[in-house]
Swiss-Prot record:
One of its GO terms (molecular function) is hydrolase activity. InterPro entries: Calcineurin-like_PHP_ApaH (IPR004843), Metallo-depent_PP-like (IPR029052). This is Uncharacterized protein L509. Gene3D superfamilies: 3.60.21.10. It comes from the Viruses.
Length: 280
């Protein structure tokens, strides 16, 4: 059996010692079935690539899994301490860090072919409408803590930046969908759907169903949720859920901050082989 475990929003930047966090320990300290192959999807907000904690985490998990698919989240780019760095600096550090571990595959608008299945990875971001842009740019930390180089100066990113990245990500996914001859599992940080009270499908806590900030967390990609996609795994909303949409598994498994109770399950997984059989 090929087992794909999936987690997100570990926020190692706020954890002093990963060895003392039992939920994290279960990601590397568990009994493996010798007949199974284990993969791990890290769906963003894992940690700051300039901190020691994420490298120590990688040292723990790298020997355990055959492949680890790592999609950066928005928090990977946060400037919490000086010296402040641009998003390009963070991307370079992410690339260099992952290159130290041959089985950790950094995926941001990338595709990985694994035998009879393909994985697409993308931070994804989201599209912020003009009507919500003023509120979201003030209330969401991305627009205060993520920096870019503009005219040789370090400055805050804008709604226009994240909207552009979102368009690029969706275009990349659409292009891969057109060319794919294999079933696809898509891995993103931002959610592919908004919560739906009528269907009872929640990609975030139902208490946020009418939040003015929803566009910073969700996309409405319902029109592209078709074959050959067989599963879409994501993070970002600090909520854990799993449901079927148009025959596709939509699932998330998020740890979140220490004061939150998000029903995180370090053993959550998808059976890749069974998923392929179900989609014959």
């Amino acid at each position: 059996m090929r087992i794909l475990r999936y987690v997100s929003d570990l926020h190692l930047e706020y954890i002093d010692c990963i060895d003392g966090k039992s939920a994290l320990n279960s990601l590397w300290d568990f009994k493996k079935d010798p007949n199974d192959i284990y993969y791990l999807a890290l769906l963003g907000d894992i940690g700051n690539p300039f901190d020691k904690s994420i490298k120590k985490f990688f040292q723990k998990i790298s020997p355990i899994y055959d492949k680890i698919f790592y999609v950066p989240g928005n928090h990977e780019y946060y400037n919490l301490n000086k010296p402040y760095r641009s998003i390009d600096d963070f991307n370079s550090q992410l690339k260099n860090m992952c290159q130290e571990f041959p089985n950790i595959i950094l995926m941001n608008n990338e595709i990985y072919e694994l035998d009879d299945i393909s994985f697409i990875g993308s931070t994804l971001w989201s599209n912020i409408s003009e009507s919500k842009s003023n509120h979201i740019s003030k209330s969401i930390n991305d627009y205060h803590l993520i920096k870019k180089i503009d005219n040789n100066k370090l400055t805050k990113i804008t709604i226009d930046d994240t909207n552009k990245w979102n368009t690029e990500s969706i275009d990349y996914i659409l292009n891969q969908l057109k060319n794919s001859i294999k079933p696809l599992i898509i891995l993103t940080h931002h959610a592919p759907l908004f919560s739906d009270n009528i269907l009872g499908n929640y990609t975030a806590d139902p208490c946020y169903i009418n939040s003015l900030n929803n566009e910073a967390f969700h996309n409405d990609l319902s029109k592209i949720l078709n074959q050959p996609i067989i599963a879409w795994l994501y993070g970002h909303t600090h909520y854990t859920s799993k449901f079927i949409y148009n025959g596709i598994i939509i699932a998330t498994n998020q740890l979140g901050y220490s004061h939150e109770r998000n029903n995180f399950n370090p053993y959550a997984y998808i059976d890749i082989d069974q998923l392929l059989i179900d989609n014959l």
